């Protein structure tokens, strides 16, 4: 839950300053992704009023402040991934060609087919798919470390949901494809169906979690650099 904060209060507190002085938002916004910056803005517009939710958010920020972790994802991955995921028109679906076999002739046909589409949708889709593979694999390693911290696991169930998705059998091919640099037509068709169509909701859930991590690390870094002390969260009386 969150309480409503009006524009006048936001201005009085200098949350989003339109003047030359730095705003509170600008002070804490060192996010590496556009998604992270947007979520931080939403947090200021919709402050939490629930003790458990505030405690959880505080614990997550405290964890990143304590461990001094940096954001391990590349911003360029998210631009490519978001652009790719935004178009779910069936006409843009990548399909494998069952007529192409393993012979040298078929291999040549396959390469020619890819070249024809290089400057259009195939190249963009391939870049988006590979970016998602990198994001999910990085998130896999990152959350595996987080899951070992009792302070985090004791206050949030979100991490369990993330691990459930990543550890599921359907995402196993994504983990196995770590570090892949190019996709064949069949590989592109397989991952396109898996990520953009069959599991679109789960993929967006993972991305949203990464954007929140971006925010927590951004806030934690600002706090540590400026010597800020984390306030103790107490329940209302």
Name every feature range the model reports, one short phrase each:
Residues 4, 205-237:
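Conserved NTPase motor "head" modules and their coupling/switch loops across ABC/AAA+ ATPases, GTPases
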């Amino acid at each position: 839950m969150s309480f409503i904060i009006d524009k006048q209060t936001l201005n009085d507190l200098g949350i989003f300053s339109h003047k030359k002085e730095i705003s509170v938002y600008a002070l804490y916004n060192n996010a590496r992704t556009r998604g992270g910056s947007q979520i931080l803005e939403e947090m200021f517009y919709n402050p939490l009023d629930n003790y458990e939710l505030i405690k959880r958010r505080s614990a997550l920020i405290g964890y990143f402040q304590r461990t001094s972790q940096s954001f391990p994802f590349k911003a360029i991955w998210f631009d490519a991934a978001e652009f790719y995921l935004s178009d779910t028109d069936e006409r843009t679906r990548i399909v494998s060609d069952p007529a192409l076999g393993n012979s040298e002739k078929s291999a040549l046909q396959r390469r020619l087919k890819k070249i024809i589409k290089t400057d259009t949708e195939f190249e963009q889709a391939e870049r988006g798919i590979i970016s998602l593979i990198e994001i999910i694999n990085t998130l896999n390693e990152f959350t595996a470390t987080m899951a070992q911290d009792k302070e985090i696991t004791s206050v949030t169930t979100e991490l369990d949901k993330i691990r459930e998705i990543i550890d599921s059998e359907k995402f196993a091919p994504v983990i196995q494809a770590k570090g892949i640099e190019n996709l064949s037509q069949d590989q592109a068709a397989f991952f396109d169906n898996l990520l953009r169509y069959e599991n679109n909701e789960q993929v967006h859930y993972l991305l949203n979690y990464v954007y929140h991590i971006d925010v927590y690390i951004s806030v934690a870094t600002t706090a540590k650099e400026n010597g800020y002390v984390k306030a103790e969260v107490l329940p209302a009386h």
